[in-house]
From Swiss-Prot:
InterPro entries assigned to the protein according to its UniProt record, in alphabetical order: AAA+_ATPase, AAA_lid_3, ATPase_AAA_core, ATPase_AAA_CS, FtsH, P-loop_NTPase, Pept_M41_FtsH_extracell, Peptidase_M41
One GO location term (cellular component): chloroplast thylakoid membrane
Stretches of the chain found on the membrane's Lumenal side: 29-116
Protein's recorded name: ATP-dependent zinc metalloprotease FtsH
Membrane topology, from the record: Multi-pass membrane protein
Residues that hold ATP according to the record: 211-218
Source organism (scientific name): Cyanidium caldarium
Residues exposed to the Stromal side: 1-7, 138-614
Gene: ftsH
Length: 614
């Protein structure tokens, strides 16, 4: 209640004082109010009015610098009107003129009260502002957190937990068993360090979690906080640097000062690449401030002070931009790769997230895990949540396989659009998708077809889905060529059925992808006549922390040879696609008829059509 009254008084008091000051000023200076309400007239026109006998009375103010004149205005039928006239400094002839014309005039000296109130009003308003700002600064200085703290810029914004209760333990983390094992050792060290020190082991000073977004790096940190019985500090890398010089380094010092007081403890820095980027390339003062912050971080982690009992756990998905001094042993003794989960990892993650969902007994998590290669843990959690929302939308009480499959399609390809009307365009799209599906079926190294559909999603008017048999960590040349042939089969089918002049832009994305794959075969994988040589630009991107300018190291002759080889690969694959499609034209016509009628063909039905024709 007291805080509320303080806020009310703090807001109302300056307003009341301001209103009182203005009212007092206006009360003592009625002449000014009179002047404000008057119209203005030039001095020359005023003299003309005197000569025309249209002036009745003149009142002089401000030491004869201003005159309020009572005139007869001929423009409004001779009615009287008050006007204001600014007089020149030397206007002695004015008094003579007024006397000669027998015009009543009077001089009004300045009031001492008015001058005093005017002086006080000019002084009081800035004084109120200064006192109010000082009150806010005092209040912010007493507080330990929150915005508007002018004296606390150098204080670290880390969240401190004596025994963090995040609600997450290692049992809640699945699919990244290797990373869990490494971090469980650190938790065990904090709980009972004697069994480690007995054999001469020392506690790691830093652990860097590296991996793509959504793989569970922050989740692992929460699990550490939930498992360890040690003090836990958490902060984001972006919270160190501010607009003021020196604030970042000051916050690093403050953070580690607090951490040393609670040692042994854990400091978790999320997105450390925001402050730990490679030094020496940026332009401008902002980069200098970031480098000062990084230098202070390096000193605190392994400087002259030696072992402090503070374990730093950091997370990043951009290890390539981090400064090499930050990555050396003694600062980050362990670099733990948190990769995208394989099929077994995805299955374990799905089991964890499905515990709190009402899943129908017919749902096969193994099939879902196989259908989601490349999905991170966050993607899988989002998948089941989307399926749950879709279940409620459809009025069901349990999540079925249909909702999960539709959610996978939505996440990968976007929202489902309106079905196409029966037309020539619909048949053209059907031939395009049937070309992809049939060509892939007759390529021994290609993934099997999972579904063919004419339901639009995002920019795609039709889609052909493939189901990989397993996670492909190593891809062969035959597999890459098979993917290129199947991708070009859509354009090839359009040309076979409708002729070259009628091909559409529908294959634009296919052409973009196959060009990239073919160029990778030549310049990176050494799978061409150019030979096993890496021709990619090895320099890093501009401004990510290493090189200021990118360099192109290939000769013009080699660039021409690469382009020629890429065109040769794509041309050969296109010819093979046309050959496969021409040999199976009747099968493709059957698939197209089914597609136009049903709009979606699942894997079992598609294979039944293929087996009947073959």
């Amino acid at each position: 209640m007291k805080k509320q009254w303080k806020k009310i008084v703090l807001f109302v008091l300056p307003v009341i004082i301001t209103l009182i000051t203005l009212s007092s000023f206006l009360f003592y200076n009625q002449d000014v109010v009179h002047n404000w309400s008057s119209s203005r007239m030039t001095y020359g026109r005023f003299l003309e009015y005197i000569d025309m006998n249209w002036v009745k009375k003149v009142d002089l103010y401000d030491n004869a610098r201003t005159a309020i004149v009572d005139i007869i205005n001929p423009d409004i039928k001779g009615e009287e009107q008050l006007v204001r006239v600014e007089l020149p400094t030397f206007s002695s002839e004015l008094v003579s003129k007024l006397k000669n014309k027998l015009i009543d005039f009077d001089a009004h000296p300045s009031s001492s009260n008015v001058n005093l109130v005017s002086w006080l009003s000019n002084l009081l308003l800035p004084l109120i502002l200064i006192i109010t700002l000082f009150f806010f600064f005092r209040r912010g200085n007493k507080s330990s957190s929150g915005p508007g703290q002018a004296f606390n810029f150098g204080k670290a914004k880390a969240r401190f937990h004596m025994e963090a209760k995040t609600g997450i333990v290692f049992e809640d983390v699945a699919g990244i068993e290797e990373a869990k094992e490494e971090l469980q050792e650190i938790v065990a060290f904090l709980k009972d360090s004697r069994k480690f020190t007995n054999v001469g082991a020392t506690i790691p000073k830093g652990v860097l979690l590296v991996g793509p977004p959504g793989t569970g790096k922050t989740l692992l940190a929460k699990a550490i906080a939930g498992e360890a019985s040690a003090p836990f500090f958490s902060i984001s890398g972006s919270e160190f640097v501010e607009m003021f010089v020196g604030v970042g380094a000051s916050r690093v010092r403050d953070l580690f000062k607090k951490a040393k007081e609670k040692a042994p403890c854990i400091v978790f820095i999320d997105e450390i690449d925001a402050v730990g980027r490679q030094r020496g390339v940026g332009i401008g003062g902002g980069n200098d401030e970031r480098e000062q912050t990084l230098n202070q971080l390096l000193t605190e982690m392994d400087g002259f002070s030696g072992d402090t009992g503070v374990i730093v756990v950091a997370a990043t998905n951009r290890i390539d931009v981090l400064d090499s001094a930050l990555l050396r042993p003694g600062r980050f003794d362990r670099q733990i790769m948190v990769s995208l989960p394989n099929i077994n990892g995805r299955l374990a993650i799905l089991k964890v997230h499905s515990k709190k969902k009402k899943i129908h007994k017919d749902v096969l998590l193994e099939v879902i895990a196989r259908r989601t290669p490349g999905f991170s843990g966050a993607d899988l959690a989002n998948l089941l949540n989307e399926a749950a929302i879709l279940t409620v939308r459809r009025g069901k009480v349990e999540i079925t396989m249909k909702e999960i499959e539709d959610s996978i399609d939505k996440i990968i390809a976007g929202l489902e659009g309106s079905p196409l009307a029966d037309s020539r365009i619909k048949r053209l799209i059907a031939y395009h998708e049937a070309g992809h599906a049939v060509a892939a079926t007759f390529l021994p190294h290609h993934d099997p077809v999972q579904k063919v559909t004419l339901i639009p999603r995002r920019q795609a008017k039709g889609l052909t889905w493939f189901l990989p048999n397993d996670d492909q960590f190593l891809v062969s040349k035959s597999q890459i060529l098979s993917k290129i042939i199947a991708a070009l089969a859509g354009r090839a089918m359009e040309e076979i059925v409708f002729g070259l002049p009628e091909v559409t832009i529908g294959a634009a994305n296919d052409i973009k992808q196959v060009t990239f794959m073919a160029r990778q075969m030549v310049t990176k994988f050494g799978m061409s006549k150019v030979g096993p040589i890496c021709l990619e630009n090895s320099s890093s991107e501009v401004f990510i922390g290493r090189d200021l300018m990118g360099r192109h190291e290939l000769s013009e002759e080699m660039v021409a040879k690469v382009d020629l080889e890429v065109r040769s690969i794509l041309k050969d694959c296109y010819i093979q696609a046309r050959t496969i499609l021409s040999q199976n034209r009747k099968l493709i016509d059957r698939v197209v008829n089914e597609l136009v009628e049903k709009e979606t063909i699942e894997a079992k039905e598609f294979m039944r059509i293929v087996e009947e024709r073959v």
